């Protein structure tokens, strides 16, 4: 099902406006996040319905999971906001790289959806692989964080495997890692299913597209692990005796748990997404 860029642009503006407004009203995004969300969603859907679907699956599932167990998260997360209320920085950290890759890929393909096929174009395959890795990482990290904190299991610091308090950057649980794997799988399935309607491949190439699912699943897990390693090493975590919570900045009432104060959560997310996108793009060229 091939559609013109003009039609996709009109559709993109309408659907992006509705979702951004709804998300703002439901406090999933603040005003700046709503504006940024509208822009990146418009870019994705104009580029292709499959790219828009990847962004939408990540955003909608993550927003839903953010609201699960809010009372428990409020007691643990020092930066807890009802509904999430993500701002423009968070939106761009989680979709900026993909937006650039989407525009480059579509410019090279004449704004047509293409299958992963290195024989046809290694560059386009690498770009599409990077987009898949991007959202697998975003989804994996978010599902892992939002569901892992609800687990009754004691988190362990990924670098030392020592037990740490919930909310500690770099703390992992089995439930969180399984959630990351499931999140990556969801992204892969979305890419594959929408591709049935938006891209046409030769039979041998079409069969290989099934490998997107395990690739995306591993990208979700890998992205979550990279995020955890960065969080445990170059992001500060300490326990505040006054607030009785894990905090991300040193202070007179804060006892250090792990990490040095180099990057904040947005910085860690950005770097982990960048690395996962790069690794997935390279893997895609060799696999497809």
Swiss-Prot record:
It is a multi-pass membrane protein. It comes from the Eukaryota. Keywords: Cell membrane, Membrane, Transmembrane, Transmembrane helix. GO terms for cellular component: plasma membrane. Expressed in the vasculature of leaves, roots, inflorescences, siliques, anther filaments and sepals. Detected primarily in the phloem tissues, including in the root ans shoot apical meristems. The chain crosses the membrane at residues 1-21, 29-49, 91-111, 123-143, 177-197, 210-230, 268-288. Pfam families: DUF92. It is found in: Cell membrane. Its main location: membrane. Induction: Up-regulated by glucose. Down-regulated by STKL1 and STKL2. Involved in the glucose-triggered developmental leaf growth process. PANTHER family: PROTEIN PGR, TRANSMEMBRANE PROTEIN 19. Belongs to the TMEM19 family. This is Protein PGR. It comes from Arabidopsis thaliana. The gene is PGR.
């Amino acid at each position: 099902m091939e559609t013109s860029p003009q039609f996709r642009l009109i559709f993109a503006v309408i659907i992006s406006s509705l979702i951004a407004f709804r998300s703002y009203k439901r406090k999933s995004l603040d005003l700046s996040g709503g504006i940024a969300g509208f822009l990146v969603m418009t870019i994705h859907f104009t580029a292709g319905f499959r790219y828009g679907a990847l962004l939408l699956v990540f955003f909608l599932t993550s927003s839903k999971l953010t609201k699960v167990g809010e009372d428990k998260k409020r007691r643990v997360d020092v930066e807890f906001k009802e509904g999430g209320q993500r701002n423009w920085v968070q939106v761009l950290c989680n979709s900026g790289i993909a937006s650039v890759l989407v525009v480059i890929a579509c410019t090279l393909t004449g704004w047509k959806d293409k299958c992963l096929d290195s024989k046809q174009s290694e560059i386009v395959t690498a770009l599409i692989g990077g987009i898949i890795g991007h959202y697998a990482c975003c989804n994996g990290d978010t599902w892992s964080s939002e569901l892992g904190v609800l687990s009754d299991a004691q988190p362990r610091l990924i670098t030392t495997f020592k037990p740490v308090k919930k909310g500690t950057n770099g703390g992992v649980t089995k439930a969180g890692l399984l959630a990351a794997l499931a999140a990556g799988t969801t992204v892969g399935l979305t890419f594959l299913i929408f591709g049935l309607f938006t891209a046409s491949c030769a039979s041998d190439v079409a069969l290989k597209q099934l490998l997107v699912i395990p690739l995306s699943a591993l990208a979700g897990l890998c992205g979550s692990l990279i995020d955890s390693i960065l969080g445990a090493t170059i992001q500060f975590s300490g326990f505040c005796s006054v607030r009785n919570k894990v905090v991300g900045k040193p202070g007179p009432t804060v006892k250090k748990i792990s990490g040095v104060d180099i990057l904040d959560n947005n910085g860690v997310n950005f770097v982990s997404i960048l690395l996962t996108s790069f690794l997935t793009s390279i893997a895609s060229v060799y696999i497809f």
